[in-house]
Structures are given as C-alpha cells and as structure tokens.
Amino acid sequence: MKKFLRKPQFWLLTLGGFLSTSVILAACATPSNSALQTVFKARSSQFFNGEQGSLQSALTTALKNPVANKQFIAAPLLKALEAWYENNEDKKITQFLKDTKSNVDSQYTTAVDKVVSASRNKSLFVQQDLLDNAGGSEATWKAQKLLEQLISDFASRVFQKNYLNYKKDGQVSTGPFTYDELHKEESWKNFEFSAPRFSETNDDFFAKIQSQVFDQWVEYTDPTLISQVNYKYSAPSQGLGQIYNREKLKDKLTPSYAFPFFAEEKDIAPNQNVGNKRWKQLVKGEGAITDNNIGQSGTNSQKTGLLKYRNESNKGDFLDFPLNLSDTNETKQLVDASNIVDQLEAANLGAALNLKLQVFEQDNDELPQIKELKEDLNNTIVVDKSKDVEKASKTNALFYNDQEGKQQQSDSDPIAGALDDIFAQNTSEGTNLSKLAEQVKKAAATKMEAKTAVLRTNNSKGQQNNYVVLDAAIPTFNSTTSKSKNNSASNEVLVALKSGSINLRQVQQTDQNSYSPIKFRIVRNSTGVTVFGLDGGSYYLKQDSTNKKSVSKQSLTLLTKSSSGNSNKVLRDLDKQKQFLKFRAFQAKTNTFYSTNFAFSFPLNETLKSWFDKHRELILANALVNASLDQKDKASKALTEAFNPYKELIKEFAPVALATTMISFYFDQMKALNNKLLERARNLNQNVNQANPTPWLNGLSAKLPYVNTNGNYEKLNNYFTFLITKTLWPKVGQEETSISEESNKLKTKTADVDKIRDKILENIQTKVNDFVKNKLKPALAPRPAYSNVILLNVNNDKVLSSGANWSLASLLQSDKVNPLSFMLLKQAFDNNDLFKKAQKLFKDIQEKSSNNGGMQSSSTTNSDADALSKVIGNYYYTTWAKLTDKSIYGNPKDNKFDELFKLAFEASIDEKSFNVDYKAVIDHYRFIYTLQWLVDQKLKNFKSLLKTNLKFGEVAFIAYKNTETTNFSNPQGVFGSYFNYENSASEVKESTQTLDPNNFFYKTTTKPTVQAIQQVASLALVQKQQMQQNSTDHYGFTGLSTSTSSMFDASSRDAILQQITKTSLQQYGSKDQLKKIIQGTNNQLLLDRIAVQLSGLNPSTTNGGSGKTIATYFQVDAVGNPTLDFQAKRKLLLDLLDQYQNYFGNGAQKSQRDSTPSGTGNYLTYQNGSDKYTYTQFTYQDIDSLSLTTTSGTNNKIASDVVAALLLFQAADKGTQQLALSAINKPQLNIGDKRIESGLKLLK
C-alpha cells in the first residue's frame, strides 16, 4: 500500500515542544541559560494529572513490579547491614565496611568527573544525570552503591561454609556417622543449620541466615532430586552400517539420538561393564539396597526389577541406583523450578515434568506404558506396540500407524518414502530395531504414500506397522510374579491399590494380565537412554486442608492415580520436603552412603547462593524478618535494632514482593519451556524444509510425546501453574478454585491459565495498593535544585523515602517504556470521543469475525464492521509476521490462518500480563483510531487521501500475487514440517518452497477472477459474478500499487503498469472527460504525455478521425522542428480520440481481455517467472464509488471487502496515523516528572 502523507509527528509525540521550558531560578543560581533550558518545568504535583498518576498509584505500580519492588526493601536492608558490619567483632569485616565507604566516595568523585559540562553547569547536570535516578541526593547515590557492594560481600560470607549439621541431644555431632542411623525418618528432626561445635565469629549468625534461605528455596522453588541411570549409545562390532545406510549418511552416521544403537552384550569386552551389560542388571534389580541389607523388615526385599531400587521401609520413599549400573558417574541430579528448564535437555525436561505432575495427581500427557523391560536396550527403544506396550498413540510414538485416521494420498510429495534411506538394504540384526528397518523398507516398497513419514496411514495391502520408536515411556509392573523368559526380565510385583490398608501379601493375589504404571520414566535423549524417578517424591506429599490424613505411601509411590472416587488434592508437605532434602544434603556433605557404590553429590551451598543471588534483597529481607538472632552477639544486636523500626512493614511486604517476582518468573518459564521444546523441533525441521530436503539425516529423531496446542505445551506447563496456584497465590491473595480448578484438578488450557494470571494480578494490585495507602502514605518531598523528577516522602522517614524513590527510579528508567507513561497516553486516548467509537468498531469487527469463524462467505455487507471483519486477519497477520520465531503459536488448524494470527495479535496487546508490551498496545490504539478516522462519514477521509495522492490520469492497480496457488498451507515450512516434530495438535499437511510468507497471507474474501466473458459485460454483471465466487479466503492480496509504491518487486510493478498503459485510457475517465482536459490545457508536456500513450494503442479503423493518425503529432521538418504548433496538436488529439473509444469504460475491459487471453472478467493476469499476478486497474474515478456496504445488485467495481483490506493497510501507515491524530483536540498534559515525558517519546 502506498505510504501516503508524511505529516509532522502528532501532538502526543512532541510533548517536549511545550513542556520542557525553563524555570526561573533563585538569584544565586549560576548555570548558563542554555543549561537551564534542560530543567523540566512541572505542570503537576503528581506524576501526571489523573488517578493513575497520583503519588500513591505511582508507588503502588512500582512496588508491584517484579523488578522495581526489591528496591523499596534495599534501604532498610542497608541500614541493618551497615550496623552489622560496623559492630562486628571480626575486624576484617569492620575494615571492609570502611574500605567500601571509601571506595564509594571515590566512585562518586569519578562519576561526577565524567559528567561533561562547563564548571558553572556542573551541579545542574550532576543532579539531572547522576542523582535524579538514585534518590535525588549525593547521600542516596552513595547509599545505593554501598548496598550493592555490601550485599554481594555478605552473600559470599554467608555461603562460604556449609552449616548443615546433625545434632544429638542438642549438641552438634562431629561423627562418625552411619547410614543405618541417618536414613531413619525419626533421625531427620536432628538435621539443622547451626554453628559447628568449634565455631568461629559469626558462624551462628551465618547458619541462621542459611537456614532461612534454605526454607525459602524449598518453599518457592520445589527442589527435586532426580535419581537416574544413563546408558550411552554405542556401535555394534561390525559398525552401524549393518543397520543404517552408510552410503547415504556418510560422516553423519555415528551412534546418536538420530541413529541409536547399543552394542549387544556379546560384543562388550569381558572386562567392561557398560551399556547392555549394565542394563540387564538394572532390569533384574541387581545391586539394590534392600531391607535385609540394612537390617530392616519391610517390603523392598519382595520386589523385583526397577521397584527394588525404590526403598520405602523407613517412609522416605528413597530411590537409589548403584553407580556401577550407570554409564555416567552421577546417579542423582538436583533441580528446582527456577532452573529445571535450563538444567535439563528437552527430552529429560518433558519427562521430568510429566512425572512431577503424576506425583501431584494433576493432568499430564499420556505416555506409552512398557509392559516388560527387555534385556536389550535396542528392544526397549523400539517396541512392538501390539504386544510390548499399552497406550501407544500417534502423539507419543514415532512411526505410529493411526488405524483410525483418514488415509492420506499424495503422488507428488517429494519426501514420501524418504525414511527408506535411513536403513541399510539388508539388516541382519535380530533386534526390534532391525525389524523396524524391515517394516520401513516394506512400507516403501508397497508405496504407502502417507505424507507423515510413510507409516501414518492404513495400508491397503495389509501391511502391519507394529514397530514404533519411543522417546519417553513408563515402565509397568504386573500383578503376578513370573520367571524370566528368553531375553526379558519381569518387574512385576504390585497392583493398583484403592486403599493404603491393603497389605502387600494380599496384593499379590490378582489377575495375571493387569499392568500398572510405576513412577519411573524411560527417556531416549541425546546421549543414550536414561531411566529416572523422583527421590523422595511421594514422601513429602500431603492431602489438602479438607483432609489432613497422610497419603498412602503405596498409592503415591507406585501408582499413576488415586482411585476415581478420591476427591482429595495432593499438596507438598514443606516440613517433610525440607527434612528429606537436609538428609540427602548431609549424606553428600559427610559421604555417609550405604556404600561408595551409592555416592552422589548435593551442591547445597552453591545452589543456595545461586538462588540467593537472583533475589538478594527480597530473600534477605524475609530471612531477617523470620530469623531469631542471638542478641548477645554485638553485631546481631546492632542489626536487629537497626532493622526493627521497619520489621513489621517488611514482614507484610517482603513475602508479597518475592511471591510476585516468582509468579512472574514462572509464567516466563512456561514460555522458556515452550521455546526449548520448539527449538529442538526447529533444528530437526531444517533438514526437511530446505530447498533440497534430506529428512534421512534426522534418522529416528522424533517428536517428543507432549502435545503442543497453539504453541504451548499446556500439560507440561501445568507444573508451573501448580506452584503458582498452590504455593504463591496464597501469599498475595487467595486461590479461587472456581477459576483455577475443574474436578479437583488444575485447568490446563492456556485461556484458563490466563484467567488464573489475571485474578492473581488483581490480588497483587489490591494487596500492594492497600499496603501503600494504609502503611506508607506517600507525600511530595521538596525537589532539589535543577532536579527533573518527583521525589517522595514516606512516613517522614529518610530510609523508607529512599527505598520508595529507588523503586520509582527502577520503574522509570529512561531507556525503557515505563507503565506510567503508558497509563498517561492510554488516559488521553480513553478520553477521546472518536477513540471510543473506534473501540466499539473494533469490538464489533472481532465479534462478527468470531461468529463467522473468520471465513465469511456472504457477499452482502450491511455495516462497516461487516466488511472489515472479513479481512481483519490481515491486521492480525502483521503481528505474527514480525515474529522472529513464527512457530511459537503453533500451526493453523484446517488452514484457518486468521485464528493463528489472532493468537499472536492478542498476546501482543495483552494489558494484563506481567510483561505488557506497552508499545504494541499504543500502536494498536493508534491503528484503531486511524481506522475509525478513515471510515467515518462514509470513508470521507480515506477518499480525500486517495484523491490527494492519486492524480487524475495516473495509472494504478489492485493486485494479488499467486492467489490461485493451491498448495499453500505451509509456505517455506514456516509452520514446521509434516513430520510434526512439534507434536502440534494441528498437524501440517504439506510443505512448499515456492511462496513468500512475508506478504502471502494478506487476503480478501472476494475472488479476483470471474468466468471468461465473451461479450462486453455491464459493470453490474461483473460485480455479481464476483459476489457469486465470494466463498472463501483468497490470499496474496497486495493492495494498491502506483508508479512509486508497491508491495512487490519494481520490475513486476512496472511491467503491469506498462501493460495497463498499452490497453487502457480509463485513468482519464471517459472519452468526453479527456477531451475536456485537452481543450482546457495550455500545458505542452501534458499533451505530449497523452500523445505518447495514444501512440502505443491500436486505433479503431471504423471510428472517426478522417484518416488522421497519431504519427502526425510527432512529425518534424528538415531541421527537426515540429510541423504542428500547439493549437494544431491539440486539435489533432481531439480529432483522433474517437478512434480510441474502445479503451474507455467497458470497452477497455473488452480490449484488455482480447489483448490478454488469460484475462478474465474484471481482472487480468501477468506472469513473471513462477509468480502470477492477478490485477485490476484502479482510477481516480473509482474513488467516489468506494463503499464498505454492499447489497445484491450493487455496481461497485471494487468489492466491499477489498475496500476494507485497503482501509486496513492505510490505517497501519504511520503517516496516515500522524495525520489522523493531529486532527483531534490537543489536551493539556499536566506532567510532574520528566521521566514520564521521556517514556512518552519511547512510545512513538
């Protein structure tokens, strides 16, 4: 669309022009006049006039911000820390304080020196550039720098030692420690953070801080120990070429996730215990810690298989794997909710969260269940779904044959059958992997042409596709105990329990074929196969407050779900979780293991310090509120006395602030989780979607078995929702289960999670607003000389005032769009009458679009919103098109692109999220305002713009690019590939490389072609035929093109303009109109331009003209002078026009069709290589007939939805927006802080 009118920026974007004026300073002031011009003249004693600009509202906004809130606590913390350092008996610590203060003084001097200005202006620019954003004074600047250095040093001191100890009879024990004693649950109450028996100065204080940090870490992040064994891929003795196609794969063929293999036991050297050797021992349960081993009577000795490694005899729900059964030297990994996405690779991450959700009895993705673990790993990752597994489906197994799906048919798919190239021609191995190879070869030979990797459809020849590849699965146990047969090991012992009262001996009398899942996961990942479970995962669970009875250990540890009649909800028991983690951490600290074969690491101090460093101020504030410090210690007493005046305020605010920060963080982690799994898919798609696809290089790479809906792995994200609702929401409000739950389980749909978030944000707003209003009561503080910012006085307390001003400075950073500037601009829009109409118009558009599913077939449009709703997807698309990663919202369902684009659009303008894109929201406001301005009074302003910029006689056209393409569901693979590595609920059917996704998705509902017309048709008939074909969306719309602007390349644009010039004079209106122009002009250049165009046309020999030809116009005499003067030339043109009457009106349409055989109806075509353009000429005379309302029989040349599409393009034009906004009344913006003005400029 042509970029019409470049007017000056509208009033809201040039606030500096009338607000940044000088103020009259006191007589003693010395800065120059030019320097004084930088002093902001406040027009309000608030941040801006209006409720949201009040001092209270601004401070509330800062204190609920996850980044700015910690600054409020910083000032009281500094006072407490300074007292502790100053009164410490460790002279090194007191000296550090002195040195740091001296260092801060030097930093301040250096910072002042870096402020470049004349000496007389120094104080002015120091105030504005240095002090305004640090609380307003030299003292607050230095205090902020001092805190940064003190709290960093403090953290290094607190976590220098590990203070977790074991107490016997109230005394710290120095050992020796035994596993028999420590592993008993009754001993765990003796673990605590305390000073060692032979302590040093500050050890007791540091231990108490560590204890508080540990408690917060457990509560806010749900730490988890994953117990695991790993088995690495390895090549067979004769090389991978005996399974895979070495000739095709070449150097890519190495044991890996794409080309998995595990050497058979017979190929492993006798002196090595790796891979399949270890695996065989694992599935038999060898080397496990049993009750008999530790002198206990219990159930563990009665188990077999994997369950032997799960020890519950002491109620700890231990899961311990021997080191000698793993190919890696670690069998435990510590993760928590704050780092799990970063710590685990995608395959392990998905399985771990799936298992966590199973333990919490929340909805999770269904995984295949392995009935029996084979003794060969190759028969574990590839299984026969007809007998080896249950619940295998197309969403959780690669190469799944969907017997219920519709048969796909494709004779032209270039990649169909390509998986045949993965495997060698002859696979002699007898494993399931080789049987899968045979299956793929046979499928290719029988020409199964399903688009989704050969094996997705029914085989008309009866091909049985039983072998599937698993990426994650759940092992099961059988209800009976049987002997090991052939190459399999049984892991059956127990059945699903309805009640914890059933003892194990009774349980064994059950049906032979009953398989129940156990709480382990088997994962195929980048390095091999991992088997893991959660260590202690069910020990620290409890039922909710409606029933405090402990959850049955058997039902929680062994079974997937409680009985269907159980309405109790499972929550974490924080005390037990802390006890269990202390036990494991102390084991690692003291190397007190059952044996060295069960050793593991537990990096407690590193983990706690990492957690502390992320939220230092908030965590330390909570710690000081709750810690009972020794008042006999001089430093602790001084800290307490300094902190006490603020303790109650911080006790009320700090938990809310930390919870707010973590809630925001966990919502971000949902996005990070989505991105991690999608990034894995993107990497796999590269080999499929390139110009010359090589899908065989992906080998047996598969989609992970977690369903992606609209770009979200909703059920995996449910883990973070669980922590947010059950742990954090109660700190800022009260969970409303009517919003968060359904049938006693958390809702998982993204729309439902958004409602949970919205309610939490409401609670945070209420909580913080009440705190500010009732406890802080901010007032205006005196403004320092030359200052440009508002400073607050909180309770007449310098410390609290500094914290408040630091928090505001963090919120109002000059290089970022801030929420207060956004609120002011939003307020200005909301108070405008035309904007109110614009909001209603857009709401009507969305409602009509939703009611018709975005696919409107009716040709009648009764209102502006009717027509615009047909093409509103073009506006949504502009948001989606800007995304760097276009896969984050998933795939279109049934090619309904608008629904996908709308998701991206709505997310971008969401004003309720923790991370509002203020710029996107304001851009949307400008757009709908401008749209209303263009639409108002029957398109008055739109038509005026067109007439101003499209001159009479100028050639222009409306065009579509490749609109007739049928294979366009996934241009250039932007929606992934048909292998569906994303595991999207909406699968991509195909991929093509010929379309440009950058503008292809603009559309109209009117089809730009009609059936061929043999005779000159009336305009009404043409329009009627267009309407009859108005049945679906027609993509490739490129808007209005002129000689200076077009959405496609210049060569194609110029060729079409030239084609129009050679076939039409419609740009001049009618023949009579052109005659009037010729008769009335004295412009030689105009006459020459008309003559040149006539010379390119074929005149009619049957019309008038008395034998005259246009060639006469250009004749010259012997010396090169024109033989005709101006008057003669004008008369010649007038005489000749009758010969060209077929190039006007309907005659021009016939002429164009006749000269271009491919032209049909009102539209013509132009071919440029593989691109086909369908276009129709647009003239000055067409402007007045433009309308958004159309009824049957209307004779408008341009259909109403096409007009609507043009309007959307025009409303998005920045120049048009400036023109529209400059037309409204300019309200007086009364601002009291220059940072608000700076934020407005960033919203341009």
Curated annotation (Swiss-Prot):
Location within or outside the cell: Cell membrane
Keywords in alphabetical order: Cell membrane, Lipoprotein, Membrane, Palmitate, Signal
Recorded superkingdom: Bacteria
Residues with lipid group (S-diacylglycerol cysteine): 28
Lipid moiety-binding region (N-palmitoyl cysteine): 28
Coiled coil residues, start to end: none
Membrane topology: Lipid-anchor
Main localization, broad class: membrane
Keyword Plastid: no
GO terms for cellular component: plasma membrane
Signal peptide: 1-27
Pfam families, alphabetized: DUF3713
PROSITE patterns xrefs: PROKAR_LIPOPROTEIN
Annotated family: Belongs to the MG307/MG309/MG338 family.
Protein name stated in the entry: Uncharacterized lipoprotein MG307 homolog
Organism: Mycoplasma pneumoniae (strain ATCC 29342 / M129 / Subtype 1) (Mycoplasmoides pneumoniae)
